[in-house]
C-alpha cells in the first residue's frame, strides 16, 4: 500500500507487483526515509517506525559543481542583447516559426568538450558546456547588457560526497541537503586546473 499527497489530501493506492521509486537523487532518499527505510537511529529520533534498516540511504550524494567564467567578446555578437530586448525576442520567435531555425532550435549548450586535468589519467575528468550568452546566475530573467559567452566547466568525477536527510516525518517537508562541494583536496585541485585550462583555451 502506498500513501501519497495530492491536492493537500492524503491518498492510498495498492500495488499488485513491484513498486518502482524514481524521484531523483533528492526525492528518492527522502521518500525512503519517511517510509521507514534508512538509518535506524536517525529515523527513530524523528519518530519514524523502522521498516528496513539501510544505512546508505541518503548518503554518498555526488554532484558536478559547474564553474561559469564569463568572457566578453568584441567584434562578435552573442545572444545577450537580442534576448534582453522585446524586438529581439520577437525576431527570435519569427525566425523559429517561419524557418525552424535560430536560438529556439538550440540546445542548452552549443559546444561540448572533454579533457584531462592530468595527462596520466586514463579518461577525461573535465567537461565544458559552452553557451553564446551570459548572465549573473542560471535562470536569471535578464542577460548581461554586453556581448559575451560562457564556457562552463565541471569536474565529472568528483570525490566530494554529501547527503540527503529528512528533518521530520512529514514527506512534504523539504529534506536537508548537504552537497559538500570542494570538500576534498582532489576536487579543489581539479577545479583550479579546469579554470586555468579554460583561460588557456580562450585567451
Which residues make up each language-model segment?
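Short, hydrophobic/aromatic-rich segments at coil-to-beta transitions
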Residues: 1-3, 148
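Core beta-strand elements of the Rossmann-like FAD/NAD(P) dinucleotide-binding domain
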Residues: 8-23
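Structural recognition of the beta-strand scaffold that forms the well-ordered cores
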Residues: 21-22, 52-53, 165, 178
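Residue-level detector of conserved, well-ordered beta-strand and adjacent loop positions
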Residues: 3, 62, 167
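Mid-to-C-terminal "cap/lid" subdomains and adjacent gly/pro-rich loops that border
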Residues: 29, 39-144
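C-terminal catalytic lobe of FAD-dependent flavoproteins
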Residues: 46, 101, 108-203
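Glycine-rich, N-terminal phosphate-binding loop of Rossmann-like dinucleotide-binding domains
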Residues: 23-24, 35
